[in-house]
């Protein structure tokens, strides 16, 4: 069989050539030069297909105009028909912007914890924080159930012992199952239903039952259903303290919330619950509910002698008093961070929610044209983005979010980043146009084949594999696939053009398909395999990305394989002569060559002297296959200690009319020649030694790369949405809602004349330590005016007088405004709000001896008056140390010169009486501004609701646990995600599946025995860390009556007033589920792999205990879960998936390279190069501070596939150089290796360098993406490309010059041997795995399970 008929063994050049006609001698091919038209006319088009041979038939088909046109038509129409079918009959593809796409949601640990979290959140809507005190309804229900059980026991019915129940539980949540309406709302990807949201409060407004609120939400009245929301988080910044509770920051927050309510269209979408009808000041806003915010406490309004806590006031109330009132409600802690407590009234952030109601005006109900209502709201709410983005100040950073705003921001960011892909695509398209000799025909079909392949890949991805969303990581495909596809296009074009020695069009086409098809198949196989390795990842985003990219690469190769040969056939017959004539015509009209025209000799080397056959192309621009013309005469190479023949290299010299680009490529090739001459010949051992040293160091550093310690960054760290996502991950700011937690619902309007709460109200407010009582006066009673006068004597400094009396005794004179003088200022005589700094006005007569001087002098000090120096107390007043609302800044100082008097002024220059630093007698303070007349200060300015006897006891908040809290759960089976259609940044985990056979009173004995067993295991549980049943009220005395096993249950070590983490779920009068909490000995700071052993110990011990229960008991379906387990498995499985992907990609590449090279000494340099490249790239990632996350996991497997290309191109060039080995070197293997290495670099060096530069330039737009995975992926690809080309030109050449076989040529026999060796190695590997499994060894899988 001839080599031209063998698709695997076909080398680049065919042996048979027909004698060329003199008229066409030296012409490279049709369309390549102006004279190409004459050769084209000599071709005879076959009128009928050849009778024998597959390749002959294929060559005829692609050179026949009708068949080639049909192939192009089918190649264009089939993808369009498939895509039209997909778009018309299948749901539209959307971008998967779910944050959970980076979590391993299908893992057992994640599903267990999500089920418990959702069961808890269905009542309160919160997980991850210390849950607050619930309503009395909870404990009353459980106490009723226990009473019924005890009555049955007394009546002789002992079959159902009852359980202890809590009266309140901040982390104890009594959950109700989500209603059908709630499930419907989740399917709509919206906020939870009102019935579920109504339970998101732990105490209702006084005087009404919290359960009465349900009537508000089920009403069909317009906008009474709180259905949408905007989340706001205000972060304090600008100083070291970062306390949000300062007057400046609170005023800023209040102004922002007012701007939101004043936004056009707000009243048509706002939430209008029935309760706000009682708030008279809200009438100007059409009774829209104000933001759910603490501003309702800080900015109350006064109307008709009553205080309304609605946040509509203009003046800031007393900050401390407002906080004391708000803290009496457990809901208060929803608004602040974890650090706030009774002793530390500081928070770094403040949360707020703006609620919007449904149904909208002109709609009968929420379900009435729901999609239309939703579209209207989405169009309205996105108008807030531009406004909110400008509200941050130097003191307050404003973060805005919510379901619709999150989705809008993600999609807008994604679309903006995708615009950068057009830059890469445009550059590549221009490059295609230039490299095809400005051929519009070839450029069009080259780009079209790539685009059409993307449509087919989308069809397979969406229809065949049934994936509904495109992952956000799939956007990288827009940058990568054009470069990959264009490489294949270039291969076919350049292969066809370089086959000028073949006169027969069919032979030329057969040669092109065989050579280019084989080369592109190999590179596409390794690339697709590298991406497909990520399909086994348990991270959904990584899995979808790997599948999508492997489909695109495969479809692109198939599209190019069929489209480009047909396009080349038609181009050579019809378009090439037309393009040449058009170019010649343009040149003649312009009188000179266009600067954008690249003549055909740019792609083919000039003729050699003597009119010999044309050489192959000098500027080798293909970056996938080496096209080595064995007819080229070898260049003259100086090999130092190797004696080689000298040959001519005229072919390397450009023709006189070659443009500057051709000269540049020739110079680059000459530079590479000298470089490799040094690397592969003179210093090859030095390079190998350096390579070995770097490899060892790289292995050491690469092994230190740690798994990701946090969820992956989706966006730049400083962007609004990423900061919000960080808060969600670290502060549990996930889809939590507290719609009735503000003062509007928690406080009834109070009379200004009666701020004292009744004893019953104070009893309901909390169970902690009472506030310290303070005696304070009102703002009107405590304010006074300090008047300043002076005496000015000639030759003596002015002496100032401070007085609370406006009269002016002689010789004092009034102070005139100007020059820093202060005639008077307002002060508080008692502490008021933030005016708590005490200053004293001291008077003295010492040192005033002159007759003209006044008899007294004054000064201001922060300390007591110094009687030893003659200073006596006159009066004192209170000021603020920081700027407040309606305040001004004043300075004071004491002179260090006689008579040592003091002075106050409005600017520092007037008070520079000494150069000493600020101290008790020098500094500044803030006083109420005189610009606001006393009459204009409202009744709410500085209003303290806790005056006199205080507001009652603050609600208790448990401390943060130091160890991992493990929950043992019964009554919950898992999660139902079958109907989940969630595509939000922060998604809904699904719905809880409860165990209907679970009966708490039937199993109470087994539960008590199990809790004792777990609590007694000191290796798992900390002493005093067992919380068997929810506690909080004094019902423990009933436990011993429920079952004998429940006697002497271990009690948790709780702080005074702190309640346990255990929880009980109640529905329809029965206990539905229960969770016992245990503080584990696991330390959260341990590594994931160390923590994994703790998980296994917990799992093993619980399984052992459950096996002791009777068969058929519902407790056998119990499980243990922990939030920490979920996090560590994300890291462990992410790393395992990356390693498996790396190994799988490496095995595929090794097998492909082995079959392709057919020699172990050619395979070894490639493998060593790949190992060095990957290790060095991972080491640089470690030095850069990166961790092994989702993006890095993707990159690791891709590195192998992309690193192998350049090395294999070099080896292919080495093999092809052996086809024309000089006879003088036949006896010297060392000289043969070095000569073949240099010949390979001479022919492929410019190509692979050009390919590397093109790849790096194509990834540059990725650096500027806001989506963090895009930017990091671009950096990794650029880094890997740079390291790959460096190692290829140094390490690979040196290794080939040392160990490659000197006279080896690829044959059919060597191919079969290599294929057999690969199959044998695979069989041995499979056999070894089976032996290990038989011997009891467990093989870990990417999913975290074991075989």
Swiss-Prot record:
A GO term from the CC aspect: endoplasmic reticulum membrane
Cysteine pairs bridged by disulfides in the record: none
Membrane topology: Multi-pass membrane protein
Tissue: Expressed in brain, retina, testis and thymus.
Keyword presence, Chaperone: no
Carbohydrate-modified residues: 157, 976
Places the protein is found: Endoplasmic reticulum membrane; Nucleus membrane; Cytoplasmic vesicle membrane
Region span, Disordered: 156-207
Cytoplasmic compartment segments: 1-67, 439, 485-528, 572-684, 1159, 1268-1281, 1332-1347
Its biological purpose: Plays a role in neuronal proliferation and differentiation. Plays a role in the accumulation of cellular cholesterol. Involved in intracellular lipid droplet formation. May contribute to cholesterol homeostasis in neuronal cells.
Residue intervals passing through the bilayer: 68-88, 418-438, 440-460, 464-484, 529-549, 551-571, 685-705, 1138-1158, 1160-1180, 1247-1267, 1282-1302, 1311-1331
Identification of the protein by name: Protein dispatched homolog 3
Domain SSD, residue spans: 412-570
Keywords, ordered alphabetically: Cholesterol metabolism, Cytoplasmic vesicle, Differentiation, Endoplasmic reticulum, Glycoprotein, Lipid metabolism, Membrane, Nucleus, Steroid metabolism, Sterol metabolism, Transmembrane, Transmembrane helix
Domain notes: The SSD (sterol-sensing) domain is necessary for the increase in cellular cholesterol uptake.
Classification via SUPFAM superfamilies: Multidrug efflux transporter AcrB transmembrane domain
Family under the similarity heading: Belongs to the patched family.
């Amino acid at each position: 069989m001839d080599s031209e008929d063998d698709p695997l063994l076909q080398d680049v050049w065919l042996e048979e050539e027909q004698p060329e006609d003199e008229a066409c001698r030296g012409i490279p091919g049709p369309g390549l030069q102006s004279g190409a038209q004459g050769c084209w006319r000599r071709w005879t088009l076959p009128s009928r297909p050849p009778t024998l041979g597959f390749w002959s038939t294929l060559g005829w088909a692609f050179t026949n105009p009708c068949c080639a046109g049909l192939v192009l038509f089918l190649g264009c129409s089939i993808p369009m028909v498939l895509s039209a079918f997909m778009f018309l009959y299948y749901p539209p593809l959307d971008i998967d912007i779910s944050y959970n796409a980076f979590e391993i949601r299908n893992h057992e640990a994640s599903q267990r914890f999500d089920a418990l979290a959702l069961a808890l959140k269905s009542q309160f809507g919160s997980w991850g924080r210390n849950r607050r005190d619930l309503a009395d309804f909870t404990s009353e229900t459980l106490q009723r159930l226990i009473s019924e059980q005890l009555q049955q026991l007394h009546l002789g019915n002992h079959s159902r012992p009852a359980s202890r129940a809590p009266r309140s539980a901040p982390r104890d949540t009594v959950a109700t199952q989500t209603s059908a309406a709630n499930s419907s709302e989740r399917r709509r990807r919206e906020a939870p239903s009102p019935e579920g949201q109504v339970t998101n409060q732990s105490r209702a407004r006084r005087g009404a039952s919290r359960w009465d609120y349900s009537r508000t939400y089920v009403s069909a009245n317009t906008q009474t259903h709180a259905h949408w929301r905007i989340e706001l988080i205000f972060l304090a910044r600008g100083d070291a303290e970062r306390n949000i509770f300062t007057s400046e920051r609170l005023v800023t927050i209040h102004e922002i919330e007012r701007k939101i309510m004043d936004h056009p269209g707000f009243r048509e979408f706002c939430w209008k619950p029935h309760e706000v009808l009682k708030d008279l000041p809200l009438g100007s806003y059409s009774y829209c509910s104000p933001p759910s915010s603490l501003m309702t406490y800080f900015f109350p309004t006064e109307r008709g002698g009553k205080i309304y806590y609605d946040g509509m006031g203009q003046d800031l109330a007393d900050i401390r008093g407002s906080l004391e009132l708000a803290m009496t409600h457990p809901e208060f802690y929803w608004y602040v961070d974890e650090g706030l407590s009774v002793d530390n009234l500081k928070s770094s952030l403040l949360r707020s929610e703006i609620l919007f109601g449904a149904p909208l005006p002109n709609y009968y109900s929420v379900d009435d044209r729901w999609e239309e209502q939703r579209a209207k709201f989405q169009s309205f709410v996105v108008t807030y983005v531009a406004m909110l983005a400008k509200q941050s100040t130097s003191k307050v950073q404003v973060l805005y979010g919510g379901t619709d705003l999150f989705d809008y921001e993600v999609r807008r960011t994604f679309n903006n980043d995708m615009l950068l892909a057009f830059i890469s695509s445009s550059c590549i398209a221009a490059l295609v146009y230039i490299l095809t000799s400005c051929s519009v025909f070839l450029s069009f079909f080259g780009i079209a084949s790539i685009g059409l392949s993307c449509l087919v890949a989308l069809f397979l991805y969406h229809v065949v594999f049934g994936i509904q969303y495109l992952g956000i990581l799939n956007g990288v495909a827009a940058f990568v696939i054009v470069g990959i596809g264009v490489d294949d296009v270039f291969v076919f074009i350049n292969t066809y053009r370089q086959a000028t020695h073949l006169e027969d069009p069919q032979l030329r086409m057969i040669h092109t398909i065989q050579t280019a098809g084989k080369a592109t198949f190999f590179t596409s196989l390794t690339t697709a395999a590298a991406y497909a390795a990520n399909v086994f990842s348990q991270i959904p985003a990584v899995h979808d990305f790997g599948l999508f990219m492997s489909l695109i690469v495969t479809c692109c190769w198939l599209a190019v394989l069929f489209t480009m040969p047909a396009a080349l056939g038609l181009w050579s017959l019809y378009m090439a002569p037309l393009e040449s004539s058009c170019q010649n015509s343009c040149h003649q009209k312009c009188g000179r060559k266009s600067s954008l025209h690249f003549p055909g000799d740019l792609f083919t080397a000039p003729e050699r002297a003597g009119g010999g056959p044309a050489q192959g192309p000098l500027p080798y621009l293909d970056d996938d296959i080496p096209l080595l013309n064995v007819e080229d005469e070898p260049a003259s190479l100086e090999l130092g200690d190797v004696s080689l023949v000298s040959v001519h290299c005229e072919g390397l010299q450009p023709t006189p009319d070659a443009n500057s680009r051709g000269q540049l490529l020739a110079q680059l090739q000459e530079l590479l020649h000298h470089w490799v001459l040094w690397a592969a010949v003179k210093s090859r051992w030095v390079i190998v030694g350096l390579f070995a040293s770097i490899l060892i160091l790289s292995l050491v550093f690469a092994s230190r790369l740690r798994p990701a310690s946090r969820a992956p960054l989706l966006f730049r760290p400083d962007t609004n949405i990423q900061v919000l996502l960080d808060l969600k991950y670290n502060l549990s700011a996930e889809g939590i809602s507290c719609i009735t937690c503000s003062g509007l619902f928690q406080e009834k309007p109070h009379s200004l004349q009666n701020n004292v709460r009744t004893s019953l109200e104070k009893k309901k407010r909390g169970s902690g330590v009472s506030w310290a009582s303070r005696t304070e006066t009102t703002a009107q009673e405590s304010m006074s005016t300090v008047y300043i006068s002076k005496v000015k004597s000639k030759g003596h400094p002015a002496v100032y007088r401070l007085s609370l009396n406006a009269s002016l005794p002689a010789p004092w004179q009034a102070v005139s405004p100007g020059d820093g003088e202060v005639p008077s200022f307002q002060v508080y005589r008692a502490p008021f709000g933030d005016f708590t700094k005490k200053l004293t006005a001291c008077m003295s007569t010492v040192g005033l001896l002159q007759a003209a001087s006044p008899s007294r002098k004054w000064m201001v000090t922060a300390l007591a008056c110094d009687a030893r120096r003659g200073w006596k107390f006159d009066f004192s007043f209170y000021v603020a140390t920081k700027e407040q609302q309606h305040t001004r800044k004043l300075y004071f100082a004491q002179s260090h010169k006689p008579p040592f008097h003091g002075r106050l002024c409005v600017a520092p220059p007037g008070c520079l009486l000494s150069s000493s630093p600020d101290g008790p007698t020098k500094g500044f303070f803030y006083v109420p501004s005189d610009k606001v007349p006393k009459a204009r200060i409202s009744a709410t300015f500085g209003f303290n609701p806790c005056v006199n006897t205080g507001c009652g006891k603050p609600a208790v908040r448990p401390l943060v646990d130091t160890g991992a809290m493990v929950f043992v759960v019964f009554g919950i089976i898992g999660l139902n995600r079958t109907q989940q259609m969630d595509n939000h940044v922060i998604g809904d985990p699904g719905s809880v599946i409860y165990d209907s056979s679970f009966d708490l009173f039937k199993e109470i004995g087994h539960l008590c025995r199990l809790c004792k067993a777990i609590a007694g295991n000191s290796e798992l549980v900390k002493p005093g860390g067992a919380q068997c049943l929810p506690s909080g009220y004094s019902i423990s005395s009933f436990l011993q009556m429920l079952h004998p096993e429940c006697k002497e249950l271990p009690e948790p070590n709780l702080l005074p007033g702190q309640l346990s983490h255990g929880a009980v779920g109640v529905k329809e009068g029965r206990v539905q589920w229960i969770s016992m909490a245990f503080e584990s000995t696991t330390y959260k700071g341990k590594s994931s792999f160390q923590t994994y052993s703790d998980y296994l110990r917990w799992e093993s011990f619980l399984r052992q205990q459950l096996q002791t229960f009777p068969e058929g008991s519902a407790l056998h379906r119990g499980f243990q879960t922990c939030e920490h387990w979920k996090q560590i498995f994300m890291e462990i499985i992410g790393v395992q998936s990356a390693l498996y992907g790396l190994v799988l990609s490496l095995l595929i590449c090794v097998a492909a390279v082995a079959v392709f090279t057919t020699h172990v000494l050619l395979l070894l340099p490639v493998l060593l190069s790949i190992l060095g490249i990957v290790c060095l790239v991972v080491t640089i990632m470690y030095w850069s501070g990166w961790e092994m996350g989702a993006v890095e996991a993707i990159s690791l497997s891709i590195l192998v596939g992309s690193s192998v290309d350049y090395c294999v191109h070099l080896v292919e060039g080495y093999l092809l150089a052996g086809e024309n080995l000089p006879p003088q070197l036949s006896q010297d293997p060392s000289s043969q290796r070095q000569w073949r290495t240099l010949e390979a670099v001479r022919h492929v060096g410019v190509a692979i360098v050009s390919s590397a530069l093109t790849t790096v330039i194509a990834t540059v737009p990725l650096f500027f993406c806001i989506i963090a995975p895009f930017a990091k992926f671009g950096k990794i690809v650029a880094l890997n490309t740079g390291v790959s080309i460096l190692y290829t030109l140094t390490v690979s050449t040196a290794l080939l010059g040392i160990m490659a076989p000197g006279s080896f040529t690829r044959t059919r026999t060597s191919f079969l041997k290599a294929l057999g060796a690969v199959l044998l190695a695979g069989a041995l590997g499979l056999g070894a795995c089976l032996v290990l499994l038989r011997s009891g060894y467990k093989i870990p899988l990417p999913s975290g399970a074991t075989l």
